[in-house]
């Protein structure tokens, strides 16, 4: 059976993730409404701006239903801002009232914009657990993981910082594999469903 994976389409790299998921063998659709969230087997939370996505989750009445689906074990993959939101704790979450809100899917503390501002964005090849050759990773105002819980597996590091993790059905990267054309990370996620 083909997994139906939703891409949270409130803000961020929606189209790129949809294409990557389809190329990786999944049925993929956008999620903007509660009915669409209820219809998917798994969810991708794309890169974008974590405080903006948090605000829109509240505005669209998706925050608590999404937290509930995650608590029930719905598989999720978060890239960049998605990694930030999947954390149990966010360092430098933003201005109170407009801060990024943790969805508490992965037992980790993530620091927003840890590698620096937009001008500090970079690309590089990194080793990734489960892949035979390095991944070309694109870091755009990227976070890094500062703390992981005992059940979290580190999948990749860059400059000695944790940039990819997995905990059960939850998977996250600080970088943007959807923009490189390399579908191996999306395939790892889809194949885990």
Curated annotation (Swiss-Prot):
Annotated catalysed reactions: aldehydo-D-ribose 5-phosphate + D-glyceraldehyde 3-phosphate + L-glutamine = pyridoxal 5'-phosphate + L-glutamate + phosphate + 3 H2O + H(+); L-glutamine + H2O = L-glutamate + NH4(+)
Keywords annotated in UniProt: Glutamine amidotransferase, Hydrolase, Lyase, Pyridoxal phosphate
Active site per the UniProt annotation: 80, 176, 178
MF term (GO), any: pyridoxal 5'-phosphate synthase (glutamine hydrolysing) activity
GO terms under cellular component: cytosol; glutaminase complex
Binding-site list for L-glutamine: 48-50, 112, 140-141
PROSITE patterns, alphabetized: PDXT_SNO_1, PDXT_SNO_2
GO biological process: glutamine catabolic process; pyridoxal phosphate biosynthetic process; pyridoxine metabolic process
Domain of life of the organism encoding this protein: Bacteria
Pathway as given in its UniProt record: Cofactor biosynthesis; pyridoxal 5'-phosphate biosynthesis
Known function: Catalyzes the hydrolysis of glutamine to glutamate and ammonia as part of the biosynthesis of pyridoxal 5'-phosphate. The resulting ammonia molecule is channeled to the active site of PdxS.
Subunit-structure text: In the presence of PdxS, forms a dodecamer of heterodimers. Only shows activity in the heterodimer.
Protein name: Pyridoxal 5'-phosphate synthase subunit PdxT
Species of the source: Mycolicibacterium smegmatis (strain ATCC 700084 / mc(2)155)
Organism lineage string: Bacteria, Bacillati, Actinomycetota, Actinomycetes, Mycobacteriales
GN (gene name): pdxT
């Amino acid at each position: 059976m083909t997994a139906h994976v939703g891409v949270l389409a409130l803000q961020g790299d929606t189209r790129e993730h949809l294409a990557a998921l389809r190329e990786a063998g999944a049925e993929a659709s956008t999620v903007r409404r509660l009915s669409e969230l209820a219809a998917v087997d798994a969810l991708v939370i794309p890169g974008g701006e974590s405080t903006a996505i948090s605000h829109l989750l509240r505005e669209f009445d998706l925050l608590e239903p999404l937290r509930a689906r995650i608590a029930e074990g719905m598989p999720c993959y978060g890239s960049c801002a998605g990694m930030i939101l999947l954390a149990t704790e966010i360092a430098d979450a933003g201005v109170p009232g407009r801060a990024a809100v943790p969805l508490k899917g992965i037992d980790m503390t993530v620091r927003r914009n840890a590698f620096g501002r937009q001008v500090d964005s970079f690309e590089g090849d990194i080793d990734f657990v489960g892949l035979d050759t390095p991944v070309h990773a694109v870091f755009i105002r990227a976070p890094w993981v500062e703390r992981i819980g005992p059940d979290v597996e580190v999948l990749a590091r860059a400059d000695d910082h944790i940039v990819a993790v997995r905990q059960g059905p939850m998977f996250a990267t600080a970088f943007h594999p959807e923009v490189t054309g390399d579908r191996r990370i999306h395939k790892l996620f889809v194949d885990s469903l």
